[in-house]
């Protein structure tokens, strides 16, 4: 193994790591605030990517494709919540079930292919590993903005109430009433 190849791969790894760090924020939020380790975030993150790529390849503009992908992620989260609250499945198990199901759903969305690429020359992409320095900068700015937004939100009265409530049913009823 050539050590130079390792160093040449670092910028691409950093760019992807920042993007996956955004997904880790979702897991962190649900676990730290709600005491609910929602691992379905991992599967819904990939589902959003699959939906976006397939819709863009079929001719939909990127903004609309992202909105549809966001809705698909919300549906995945709702399914996790229904499994947990309505069917009484423990949260960690419900999220793992949804995560595993989403891997099969992702394969179905992408017509049986493990991955599908968007041609960078044909689409105007905000982040692409072809332009790694730009990808690192854009991803870092987006991650920093998201962290700042979460910090500000959880400092508000509503955010503080969510942090205080957590997974405490008595506090939830007190907040609602």
Which residues make up each language-model segment?
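Short, hydrophobic transmembrane alpha-helix segments
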Residues: 8, 28-37, 57-60
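Membrane-interface helix caps of multi-pass small-molecule transporters
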Residues: 29, 54, 58, 78, ...
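Transmembrane helix-bundle core of multi-pass membrane transporters
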Residues: 91, 95-156
């Amino acid at each position: 193994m050539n050590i130079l190849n390792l160093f040449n791969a670092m910028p691409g790894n950093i760019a992807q790591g920042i993007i996956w760090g955004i997904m880790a924020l979702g897991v962190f939020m649900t676990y730290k605030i709600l005491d609910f380790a929602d691992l379905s975030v991992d599967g819904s993150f990939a589902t959003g990517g699959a939906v976006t790529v397939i819709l863009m390849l079929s001719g939909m503009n990127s903004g609309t494709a992202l909105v549809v992908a966001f809705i698909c992620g919300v549906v995945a989260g709702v399914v996790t919540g229904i499994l947990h609250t309505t069917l009484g499945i423990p949260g960690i198990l419900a999220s793992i079930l949804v995560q595993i199901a989403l891997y099969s759903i992702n394969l179905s969305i992408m017509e049986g292919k493990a991955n599908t690429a968007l041609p960078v020359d044909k689409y105007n992409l905000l982040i692409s590993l072809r332009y790694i320095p730009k990808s690192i900068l854009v991803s870092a700015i987006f991650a920093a903005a998201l962290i700042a937004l979460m910090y500000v939100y959880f400092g508000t009265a509503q955010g503080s109430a969510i942090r205080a409530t957590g997974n405490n049913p008595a506090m939830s009823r007190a907040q609602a009433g």
